[in-house]
């Protein structure tokens, strides 16, 4: 039986940056018996022909993450599709992908040690999807009992990671549909003055990818007003 103190999960909320949050989350994932994790935010509302703003926090191999983003795998990955359509977690393995458009993606994932796992939605299905998942290098028929036994801890971990990411991104817990957040306003203000992404990041003390995420969301809010 697992015995992970609740304080370990609360410790995620005091992470000073995404690197520290990744390290602390990975430590918990390993203690749960898995090899790596992925947290994903995708804002589906966007102008035609443009890619949606995407934020990923992960300990998976960077090459796999690049593949996932390059081919927009969140659009057909069964775990991501489930997160977009449901409120409850799901376990996954080869059977989830067999005979689907995502089958080649699963074969790629296997090469990076991602053979089975669980995924947890952390916001209600809407124009923005957010979810957390972890995986291990075992086929589902072997790992399923352990996955099922640890899913309550996984849901708890998903919630804390989601809150920690929102804090670091300076996102409100329930933003108004068309209202800019304070951080979005700051990024837009500097962008209007001609600052580049890296300059905005330096001015605000955040990462360039966080700047891009805020600018992308701000653009989408403007497009639906």
PLM regions and their residue ranges:
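Recognition helix of helix-turn-helix DNA-binding domains
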Residues: 196-225
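Short hydrophobic beta-strand micro-motif common in sensory/regulatory domains
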Residues: 116-123
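Short helix-to-turn junction characteristic of helix-turn-helix DNA-binding domains
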Residues: 191-195
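Regulatory sensory and allosteric helical modules in signal-transduction proteins
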Residues: 55-110
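Juxtadomain coupling helices with adjacent low-complexity linkers
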Residues: 1-11, 18-19, 132-181
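The N-cap/first-turn positions of alpha helices
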Residues: 183-187, 212
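Hydrophobic residues on short alpha-helical segments
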Residues: 188-189, 219
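Helix-loop-beta substructure at the N-terminus of cytosolic sensory domains
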Residues: 15-51
């Amino acid at each position: 039986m697992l015995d992970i103190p609740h304080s370990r999960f609360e410790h995620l909320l005091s992470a000073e940056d995404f690197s520290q949050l990744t390290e602390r989350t990975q430590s918990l994932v390993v203690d749960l018996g898995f090899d790596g994790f992925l947290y994903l935010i995708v804002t589906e509302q966007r102008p035609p022909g443009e890619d949606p703003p995407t934020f990923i926090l992960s300990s998976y191999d960077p090459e796999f993450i690049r593949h996932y983003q390059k081919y927009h795998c969140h659009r057909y990955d069964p775990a991501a599709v489930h997160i977009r359509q449901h409120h409850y977690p799901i376990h996954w393995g080869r059977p989830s992908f067999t005979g689907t458009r995502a089958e080649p993606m699963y074969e790629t994932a296997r090469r990076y040690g991602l053979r089975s796992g669980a995924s947890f939605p952390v916001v209600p299905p809407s124009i923005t999807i957010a979810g957390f998942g972890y995986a291990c290098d075992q086929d589902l028929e072997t790992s399923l009992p352990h996955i099922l036994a640890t899913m309550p801890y996984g849901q708890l971990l998903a919630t804390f990671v989601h809150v920690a990411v929102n804090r670091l991104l300076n996102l409100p817990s329930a933003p108004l549909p068309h209202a800019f957040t304070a951080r979005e306003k700051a990024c837009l203000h500097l962008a209007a003055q001609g600052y580049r992404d890296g300059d905005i990041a330096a001015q605000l003390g955040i990462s360039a990818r966080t700047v891009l995420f805020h600018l992308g969301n701000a653009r989408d809010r403007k497009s639906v007003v």
